[in-house]
Amino acid sequence: MGYLFDTATLAEVLRAVPSRLLVKRLAGVPTSERWTTSITVSQILIAARRTRHPKLMQDVIRLVAAVKVAPFDTLAAQSFAKLRTTVAPEADTDDVMIAAIAVTHDFTLVTRRPNAFRIYPHLRVEDWTL
């Protein structure tokens, strides 16, 4: 169990003035329960590289070090295939991969985009910015 933070949530944390509610909730989660995905890490690294701001890259590296990273492994790939072929044939591939990792590990997905993930059965979704 734990909380899986998606790209939108980690991007919010990296903002100059992040959501106070999100920061407060995040601070209350033990480090052992703070997770993200290898998909999210790649997305925020790409965004940081594109901005070419060294401070943002440093902030991303610090943020990634503060969470555990769940990989897209064989079990997640099996979940992905099931989700893609049953409930999400047209959904964004990265979103389906993130959902598959969350379902595989029984994580609660924390996102600023809950409606994008509500289609997945057995996936708990929360928005900590509200």
Positions of predicted regions on the chain:
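Nucleotide phosphate-binding site architecture
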Residues: 10-11, 42-45, 70, 118, ...
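Acidic, PIN/NYN-like endoribonuclease modules and their adjacent C-terminal/linker elements
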Residues: 1, 99, 103-130
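Histidine- and aromatic-rich ligand-binding microenvironments
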Residues: 5-6, 37, 91-92, 113-114
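Generic structural signal for small/hydrophobic residues in well-ordered secondary structure
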Residues: 6-7, 44, 80, 102, ...
